[in-house]
Amino acid sequence: MVYQSEFALETEMMEQLKSNGYETVTIRNEQQLLDNFRSILNERHADKLNGDPLTDKEFQRLLTMINGKGIFESARILRDKMPLKRDDESEVYLSFLDTRHWCQNKFQITNQVSVDDTYKARYDVTILINGLPLVQIELKRRGIDINEAFNQVMRYRKQNYTGLFRYIQLFIISNGIDTRYISNNDGEIYKSHMFYWSDKENNRINTLNEFTETFLRPCHIAKMISRYMILNETDNILMAMRPYQVHAVEALIHQATETSNNGYIWHTTGSGKTLTSFKASQVLSEQDDIKKVIFLVDRKDLDSQTEEEFNKFSKGSVDKTNNTAQLVKQLKDKSLPLIVTTIQKMSKAIQNNAEALDQYKTDKVVFIIDECHRSQFGDMHRIVRQHFNNAQYFGFTGTPRFEENQSQDGRSTADIFGRCLHTYLIKDAIHDGNVLGFSVDYINTIKAQNIDTETDELVEGINTDEVWLSDQRVELIARHITENHDKYTRNRQYSAIFTVQSIPALVKYYDAFKKISKDYEHPLKVAGVFSYAANEERNEGEVDEAHSRGKLEEVIQDYNLNFGTNFSTDTFQEYFNHISKNVKKGVKDNKIDVLIVVNMFLTGFDSKVLNTLYVDKNLKYHDLIQAYSRTNRVEKETKPFGKIVNYRDLKQNTDNALKLFSQTEDTDRVLMRDYDEYKAEFVDALAELKAVALKPQDMDQVQDENEKKAFVEAFRLVSKLVLRLKAFDEFDFTKANIGMNEQEFEDYKSKYFAIYDEVKPKRGEVEKVSILNDIDFEIEILRNDRINVSYIMDLVRQIDLKDKAEQQRNRDQIRRMLDNADDPTLRLKRDLLREFIDDVIPELSEEDNIDEAYILFENAKRESEFNQFAQQQAVDEQVLKDITGEYEYSGIVNQDHLKELVGDKKLREKRQTKKAVTSFVEEVSEKYSS
């Protein structure tokens, strides 16, 4: 097959962009880029400059102010006005992007810009807006994996994007057939953040031709950068909105500004509704005819989470409304365009302070209601609507109410909000890779003819709790979870929630886990959370208050012992928040393995490091989808799906819910395939691998890069399928079961890593041109998360300093583990750790502290490396340490300090030294990280 070349693809794209209104300019180097930027800057500010273009000194002063910044800071400068003092001491404010009148910017394109900095690079197509390179397009010929283009962009970004290229907002990556966009950032950028563009009906726009015709039209790309990119002020990152988020906001804005009707947005759970609703609120609050935008949530625990998210998207945009009086004060203040509060507080404010709110009775006020299926069915909503005569209401929900799952008062979401303005269903989100599919297991735990396991209904009047909560069944399930949890969560890399039917059930399971913990070498860290009657009603089931408070106190005290905290039932909210952070952040080596709940955390709680849900209760429709969706947030390659383990027969309920909320009979688009299908796929992939290398050692003699690439691609697929197979109970890593045993897999893996190490540039070496440079090794899928630096250091601490024979056995065991290390940081520290256990450990006495000895050893080695490298490269050691310290803090090698370090060396030598220093700083920072 003959594929279109990269050059032909680039030429065709340039012509298409030109026909769409871009001006073609010839820019081949950085000086021409600066000259073009200066010319446009003068042209756009002719009036402000009074016809006097910027002088050389003035332009240099400007460059000093806007260059040398990180990506995030550059993005902030791009959207701001920059004061510049002119030579005559007058001051002028310069702007770089018109963020309100998108089409009034100047649009240009160029290609093949060369940058001759630390590394040489030539960029494919660059979109310039007002002379700044804001969009960089990287093309690969048809047939090439798009991930290779992604890796090349990431390499360029790390090595070459300096100066004005720091202003790149978006990367476009395409092989002609598959096209995606991704926001630029200072830190690591993940492939999972590459997005497809799509139309309003969520049909993907894949080809480069279609993408250029829609997404890259001048007005649209300027609008995308101006309105639909978020500066996340908490994490200091740039976020590009996904297409369905953009279409939803556009539809909502049109409905609010062009009509007086209400509406709702149906976007599946986990698709980023908070960001979408925030952007809609923000844009609406900027409209002149809208006097106030009020964002309503339902529950106290969600209020703080939503507030945190809003302030992440725009620092200080939300003032916390602690009480009704404070809310009334904020409502009276017309200078606050946006308020976040709960519908309960809003209802009280209207009931008790109606006269104070009369100013809004006829004003246009917009209410945005998050998770409206939880908050908008009831009397409170009616009270709010009666007071604001000219208000519009827009709901966001992942699980609307229909006839099948209508609210208690018999109304559907459409009955309250009217027309659905935009949909993005769970099948769409899974197809786009924005959420994960589900792998669902059903474990039969009872054999009884007296109970309907799907509905919990009595058949012959027996007590169902006696069946569901029998001691034997509860312990059976607790043991099943304990014995299979490592498999489901990839050796506890992820956490799980266990949802049960009631507080008594929660207490019984909690006690069962405590009881059996002594039977296991590595018991699970189990926590529980529930409310007693004195707390806010959370629909947790009826239970005696004194008993439940006493039990909750016991659970909290256990938590304090496990996690070094000091909570009690008197500080329940703080306890709740700490658990939330623990499960959300995934604190390494000190996280909750299983959190037992009744209803808490099953709605509105997002955690990327949660991948498993254990279920022992009846769930259906919206409750089932909401609960399942706690597990399906995208993280990285090691989390291919959300794992659901049902201890009741919820098969029909699962199918019904998925059909309703996917609007399809085809549930296979949401559920992962079964074990046999993955096994068959694995057998085929293994045959492909054997065709390339029948035995692992066959790769030892291979020199040809194409053969190495074929091996990498074949083994990578085998590894991905092993990762999926391991999540199934049927999996057995034996030749009889899947045609390969674990030792053979490890042998192939060592050859895979050998090629990876060969391709990875060594410190100070000039990077070789190789077809393997940009291949995606996806090292994450091969990592045994348990055997990492922390795990090895634990073993080192346990080395016997008294018994020399036992000490030798300990050291041999650690050495074997180091030889097979697949954790990247551990591989960097491997030689360091070997030297420590071989040279230092034998010299220690019983009285010595291994931790202290290692810290002294590592500090000395680090100091020695700095000294040797500084001498080799003839650079100042202290400046080198300063650059490293700054990199460890910010993740950026400061180019100004780098120039200072290399001094007056010749151009070629300067380039080589810069490259060597950059590699040294990155490697030594990772190697000696704690």
Curated annotation (Swiss-Prot):
What is its EC class? hydrolase
Keywords, A to Z, come to: ATP-binding, DNA-binding, Endonuclease, Hydrolase, Nuclease, Nucleotide-binding, Restriction system
For this protein, the record's CDD domains field holds:
DEXHc_RE_I_HsdR, HsdR_N, SF2_C_EcoR124I-like
A single MF term (Gene Ontology): DNA binding
Q: Name one GO biological process term.
A: DNA restriction-modification system
* EC number(s) from the headed UniProt entry: 3.1.21.3
A Pfam family assignment: SWI2_SNF2
Q: What's the superkingdom here?
A: Bacteria
The reactions it catalyses are:
Endonucleolytic cleavage of DNA to give random double-stranded fragments with terminal 5'-phosphates, ATP is simultaneously hydrolyzed
- Please list the residues that bind ATP: 268-274
Q: Which residues form the Helicase ATP-binding domain?
A: 254-418
Note the PANTHER family from the entry.
TYPE I RESTRICTION ENZYME ENDONUCLEASE SUBUNIT (PTHR30195:SF16), TYPE I SITE-SPECIFIC DEOXYRIBONUCLEASE PROTEIN SUBUNIT M AND R (PTHR30195)
Q: Quaternary structure?
A: The type I restriction/modification system is composed of three polypeptides R, M and S.
The Swiss-Prot or TrEMBL record describes its family as follows: Belongs to the HsdR family.
> Any idea what job this protein has?
The restriction (R) subunit of a type I restriction enzyme that recognizes an undetermined sequence and cleaves a random distance away. Subunit R is required for both nuclease and ATPase activities, but not for modification. After locating a non-methylated recognition site, the enzyme complex serves as a molecular motor that translocates DNA in an ATP-dependent manner until a collision occurs that triggers cleavage.
The protein, known as = Type I restriction enzyme SsaAORF53P endonuclease subunit
